[in-house]
């Protein structure tokens, strides 16, 4: 049975993503495969190429023939050179720089805005001792302010220029 290492297409229109699969040579492009040994995403920058080198070496050693696109990918990763015993087995695969974590980005933005990260919450928690003293002070204030508040209301005229007494007439 002739075995090929080929690409099976996944993804949406204009956004191809491929699996590198080992399959019978007579199966269709996206047909049943024997084993998936890697993946290839050409639209990412740089292109994502992941190949299980150990499995690729095994399938090449038992006679699996790579298709032209897979042969190019194997040369980029260095698996083809390793199989043939050629120099350059390390490959020339470009690797994307690692993305910074969201926590690092948040701390950097916070440092830029305020001068340094803080570990405190946005609203400080109310302490029980200070809240008890504030409640006692607030309770004393309305008692003292109540007689003063009643006098200005009686002296001020109601809306529309009418006195409060005229509203009691029937």
Swiss-Prot record:
It comes from the Bacteria. GO terms for molecular function: structural constituent of ribosome. PROSITE patterns: RIBOSOMAL_S16. The keyword Ribosomal protein applies. One of its GO terms (cellular component) is cytoplasm. Residues 142-170 have a biased composition (Low complexity). Pfam families: Ribosomal_S16. InterPro entries: Ribosomal_bS16, Ribosomal_bS16_CS, Ribosomal_bS16_dom_sf. GO terms for biological process: translation. HAMAP family: Ribosomal_bS16. This is Small ribosomal subunit protein bS16.
């Amino acid at each position: 049975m002739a075995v090929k290492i080929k690409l099976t297409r996944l993804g949406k229109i204009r956004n191809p993503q491929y699996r590198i699969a080992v399959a019978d040579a007579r199966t269709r492009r996206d047909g049943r495969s024997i084993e998936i040994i890697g993946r290839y995403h050409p639209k990412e920058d740089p292109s994502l190429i992941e190949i299980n080198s150990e499995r690729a070496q095994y399938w090449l050693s038992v006679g699996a023939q790579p298709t032209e696109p897979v042969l190019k990918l194997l040369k980029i990763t260095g698996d083809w050179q390793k199989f043939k015993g050629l120099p350059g087995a390390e490959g020339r695969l470009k690797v994307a720089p690692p993305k910074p974590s969201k926590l690092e980005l948040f701390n950097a933005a916070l440092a830029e805005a305020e001068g340094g990260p803080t570990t405190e919450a946005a609203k400080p928690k109310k302490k029980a001792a200070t809240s008890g003293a504030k409640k006692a002070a607030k309770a004393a204030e309305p008692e003292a302010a109540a007689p003063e508040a009643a006098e200005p209301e009686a002296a001020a005229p109601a809306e529309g220029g009418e006195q409060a007494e005229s509203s009691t007439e029937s």
